[in-house]
């Protein structure tokens, strides 16, 4: 499992650029690609911004955490995302990562605050750094 932390990319164009870069890294082209999206409570406007770029991405699943999960789910569905691809998580823990198929890339976007920091703490505890 590869985890790409783009939580700190504070605007949609930076997130899109990082997405394009990781698509050009061969070992990150895995069988399963998960978008992990974290929203913070004071950034409701990011739901629309992120949904616009997500609709153009290729993914197998979208995991929603943090604030505005249902709003984000509805916005994504209205933009053509299949609702079966969207998973709402109240929290992510080490067991969630342990249950992931090995040939998976998780691309974490949105905001680092709140749930994002919790997820980073888990990844740092159970993972190893390949690229900085």
Task: List the predicted regions and their residue ranges.
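ATP-dependent carboxylate-amine ligase
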Residues: 1-132
């Amino acid at each position: 499992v590869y985890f790409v932390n783009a939580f700190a990319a504070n605007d949609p164009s930076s997130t899109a650029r990082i997405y394009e870069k990781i698509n050009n890294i061969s070992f990150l082209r895995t069988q399963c690609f998960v978008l992990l999206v974290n929203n913070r409570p004071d950034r409701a406007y990011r739901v629309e911004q992120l949904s616009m770029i997500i609709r153009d991405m290729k993914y197998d699943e979208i995991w929603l955490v943090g604030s505005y999960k249902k709003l984000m789910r509805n916005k994504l569905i209205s933009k053509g995302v299949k609702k079966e691809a969207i998973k709402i998580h109240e929290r992510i823990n080490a067991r969630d990562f342990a249950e992931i198929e090995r040939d998976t890339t998780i691309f974490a976007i949105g905001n680092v605050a709140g749930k994002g920091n919790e997820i980073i703490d888990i990844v740092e505890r159970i993972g190893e750094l390949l690229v900085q």
